[in-house]
Amino acid sequence: MSLFNQQPIALQQRHADTAFPLVLMPSHQMANFDEVAQQREALMAQLAIHGAIVFRGCGITDDQRFDCFVTAFGLENFPYAESLSNAVRRNRTPRVFTANEAPRDVEIFLHHEMAQTPLFPRYLFFCCEQAAAVGGATPLCRSDVLLQRLEARLPRFIDRCREKGACYSLVMPGVADQASGQGRSWRDTLGVESREAAEARLASLDYQWRWLPEECLAVTTPALPLIRQTSA
């Protein structure tokens, strides 16, 4: 992969003799991302092997450049407005939105993106526009490795996870709660303006629901798979 050189980093893990994450730096300055597009298949193959890729030194200085970088991979866009995620986020471009609008002191733990909904993206791209002076790390975990270890230690539990799945419950406010990591309003989450439209959308998704005081809406998903195997 002549466009990129591999680079080791602190705390890099190795699983089945592969680095996690794989760290790539351009071998020369890129004026645009045409070369990335040309090497898309090779990069996606590396992603399937390593589980995550960290790109450094690619000249991504703002949301527009990040949008161009993501577009170079030729992947179908997953618009946030069409998702059922309950995080408050702002679109910066059609493909780029903020990770979360919650205050800095709200801790967000490891999770699969939108796994608590029937709609979720296949791939995720993250970009750090401004590095934090202190902290600010984004932790990563190889789910396949975690699953293998859980199967070895708690096989019956994993069997039950496969068998039963899980139902997720949450409460959505009538107006976005900017102080919460999960404060997206039911209007924005469901893409509706009225209670009647919200109930129709929830029924189409096989959700259960009940209305609460102050225009809040409590919902519970149908049983969703706890373990999925996706293609590369």
Where are the regions a protein language model picked out?
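Non-heme Fe(II) oxygenase catalytic core, chiefly the N-lobe of the double-stranded beta-helix
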Residues: 1-232
